A protein has these predicted regions:
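Conserved acidic carboxylate
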Residues: 12
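Two-component/phosphorelay signaling modules centered on CheY-like receiver
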Residues: 15-41
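Acidic, metal-coordinating helix/loop segments flanking the phosphotransfer/catalytic sites
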Residues: 35-62
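Active-site T/S-Asp motif of two-component receiver
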Residues: 64-66
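Receiver (REC) domain active-site loop signature in two-component systems and cognate sites
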Residues: 69
């Protein structure tokens, strides 16, 4: 795999899991990753990116988000992104241990491009490969 400079955002409140995800992404050639502790931090970053006047692709090519986080959860973050004309093209992957049938339906309703359970980190990289090509 060729190293990609496209920027990936990871919103995850667990330090251990975010380090695991980012470490695995780095090993897979995705070195340009920005980490947020919750959906609110990620949303603030995206809002500032829009205000910069530069292409959004300079700031985010893909977003990986946990579902349950403080301040703003992954479903709310996804809905905000997918209802924003400047951001809706960015793929959002919900990556959580909480993907029940009910939560999968909610993820689809808010516009998540993919939903995957946390133990499937190899599958996460395969999904990112597919969504950003």
């Amino acid at each position: 795999r060729v190293e990609s400079q496209k920027k990936r955002l990871v919103a995850e409140d667990s330090r251990m899991l975010s380090n695991l995800i980012i470490g695995f992404l780095h090993k897979s050639g995705y070195k340009n990753t920005v980490k947020f502790n919750n959906g609110k931090e990620a949303w603030n970053y995206l809002t500032e990116a829009k205000e910069s006047g530069l292409p959004i692709s300079n700031y985010a090519s893909c977003i990986v988000s946990d579902v349950e986080m403080p301040l703003m959860d992954g479903h709310r973050l996804t809905k905000l992104i997918k209802t924003d004309d400047e951001l809706k093209h960015i793929p959002v992957i919900l990556f959580s241990s909480l993907i029940s049938d009910e939560l999968r339906i909610k993820g689809q309703e808010v516009g998540a491009d993919e939903q995957i359970t946390k133990p499937e980190i190899v599958e996460l990289v395969n999904i990112i490969d597919r969504l950003i090509k």
